[in-house]
């Protein structure tokens, strides 16, 4: 009896830990491609409710069209091969904006080594991407200025 209580208590603690981070935890069943879980953090970030994330198609269709084909194909091929992976893409918000996401994926395999499920975390990397874009812009400005300088 005590072991069951401890297990329930541990489970509640782990759930609280997962749901109190800024990262968005998720799990997809590989055979059905349905979400077994997605953290409540998804709604404040993207505007879509937890309940609206039913399957992998919901994930793919809420991705920027320019990122979709590569991202989906990359994730499928890595997952089929049983390889953990990371990918950056732009996710559609409910109000038709975009947020840069880094998806970190761990492939869970059964005793035969076959892919059973995918678990991972989504991270909002929008600020990092804005900083990268600004650095690229500044670098181009510096290059342009260096060609205008009569000393070079």
Describe the residue ranges of each PLM region.
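Conserved nucleotide-binding and Mg2+-coordinating catalytic segments in signaling enzymes
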Residues: 140-152
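PAS-associated C-terminal cap
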Residues: 1-13, 66, 123-140
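PAS-associated C-terminal
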Residues: 28, 121-123
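Short, ordered coil/turn segments that flank beta-strands lining enzyme active or ligand-binding pockets
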Residues: 30-31, 94, 111, 126
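PAS-family sensory domain signal
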Residues: 9-59
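Conserved metal-coordinating catalytic motifs of nucleotidyl cyclase and c-di-GMP turnover enzymes
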Residues: 39, 96, 149-152
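PAS-family sensory domains
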Residues: 48-111, 115-118
């Amino acid at each position: 009896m005590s072991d069951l209580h401890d297990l329930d208590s541990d489970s509640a603690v782990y759930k609280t830990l997962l749901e109190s981070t800024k990262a968005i935890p998720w799990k997809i069943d590989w055979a059905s491609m349905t979400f077994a879980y997605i953290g409540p953090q998804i709604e404040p970030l993207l505007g879509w409710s937890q309940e609206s994330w039913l399957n992998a198609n919901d994930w793919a269709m809420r991705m920027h069209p320019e990122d979709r084909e590569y991202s989906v194909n990359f994730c499928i091929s890595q997952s089929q091969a049983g390889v953990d992976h990371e990918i950056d893409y732009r996710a559609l918000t409910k109000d038709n904006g975009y947020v840069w996401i880094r998806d970190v994926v761990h492939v869970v395999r059964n005793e035969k080594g076959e892919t059973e499920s995918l678990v991972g975390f989504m991270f909002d990397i929008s600020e990092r991407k804005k900083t990268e874009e600004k650095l690229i812009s500044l670098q181009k400005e510096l290059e342009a200025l260096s060609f205008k300088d009569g000393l070079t």
